[in-house]
Amino acid sequence: PELDLRPREAITQRLVEDLTEGRLDAALVALPVSEPGLTEYPLFEEEFILVRPQSDADKPVPNPETLREMRLLLLEEGHCFREQAISFCKLGSALPRDLMEGSSLTTLVQMVGAGIGVTLIPQMAVGIETRSAAVSVARLPAPRPSRMIGLVWRKTNPLGSQLAQIAELIRTS
């Protein structure tokens, strides 16, 4: 079938607003979004990956408690990935001892490459974001932090059945 894809990136809150107001047909987001007017279709689990300076490649991988004591580089407030990373470190309302913010994953990874700190990024971003930086990547110890990625659309969307078929194709591939 003909499909006119027009991808765009935005924070989850804006995507949800655009969905509910009819400006978007569907969005790939971290679940749950808990919006009653939206259908959520879980697609896959995505792991968080630690990015640290290349010089730390041979050091033990830190656990959440150790991460709290390191200079942690996170996305600015409003990004759901920031909240998910803080939740993994079990920081609650307390921020890491030494926190710095960046506006994008690219900025955070370049800051890590410059030796400023460490960060967590989604597994699907590792290949692109780390290819030109002097960094090492590592899986965190179990239980590994992750999030569910899903396709979301308005329950009233006339394309709902087609979107469910697309979601199932993504999920099974």
Report each predicted region and the residues it spans.
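Alpha-helix/helix-capping structural signal
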Residues: 13, 55, 79, 106, ...
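Secondary-structure junction motif
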Residues: 58, 62, 70-92, 159-167, ...
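Thr-Gly-centered strand-to-loop micro-motif
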Residues: 52, 75-76, 96-98, 121-122
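Well-formed, non-transmembrane alpha-helical positions, independent of function
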Residues: 17-18, 42, 65-66, 88, ...
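Flexible hinge/capping segments at coil-to-helix
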Residues: 35-73, 77
